[in-house]
Amino acid sequence: MVAAQAPDRFLQGELGCGAPLDDVELHLDRDAVLRVRTQRLALARWRDGRLDPLADAEGWWCTGDAAALVPTEDRALCVQIRGRIDGAIHSGGETVFPEQLSQRLLYQAQEQALPLEAVLFLPIASEEWGQRLVALVRCRNGWIETEGWAAVQASLRRMTSAWLSAEQPMQWLECAVLEPTLEGKWERVRWQSWLESQELGLLR
């Protein structure tokens, strides 16, 4: 644990993880990746049959998370995690975090009482953009049958119309079997293979 948010700040709607703890130093590298330095860091981890130091020579540990350090009204710093850099894609000059977008869309759907049960954003290669997103979605039984797939797609596009262009899926695909593992993780290789198996008229 390197940061904590006061309950009153959470209730006021402050975004992020709160302020760094007293014995923690935080730093963003030139790629906006969060680095942590504290005496509470483990010295090393066991990897490939040997001890691999966790921190660099100056004591900084790279978290692998893209982040922002945002000043608050009382001049404290609030940590905001944007997403895992190993899951990020580059689209049209923007760094896009698919997992964060999935959570955002599910939240918006819940706010609008739309029966969207699961969504997974996956990248495909694009000559113009580098990569573009395609969205796999699973809806509650009966929604597509009642409204029609075209109407469902229109609803999803309206919800994402204010997003950055690089964040908006170029295509929406219904996937009735879409679900994470029992641990709540996505088997991205599996679903990427499923996506590639579809006969799609995608603009690359």
Region spans (language model):
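A structure-centric feature marking long, well-folded core domains of fungal metabolic enzymes
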Residues: 12, 22-24, 85-86, 184
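Acidic/polar alpha-helix N-cap and adjacent early helical turns
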Residues: 195-204
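Active-site loops of AMP-binding adenylate-forming
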Residues: 1-14, 48-51
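Conserved ATP/PPi-binding loop(s) of AMP-dependent carboxylate-activating enzymes
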Residues: 19-23, 29-59, 84, 94-96
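Active-site and channel-lining beta-strand-loop segments
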Residues: 26-28, 65, 176-181
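AMP-binding/adenylate-forming catalytic domain of the ANL superfamily
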Residues: 160-186, 203
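AMP-binding/adenylate-forming catalytic core of the ANL superfamily
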Residues: 59, 64-165, 186
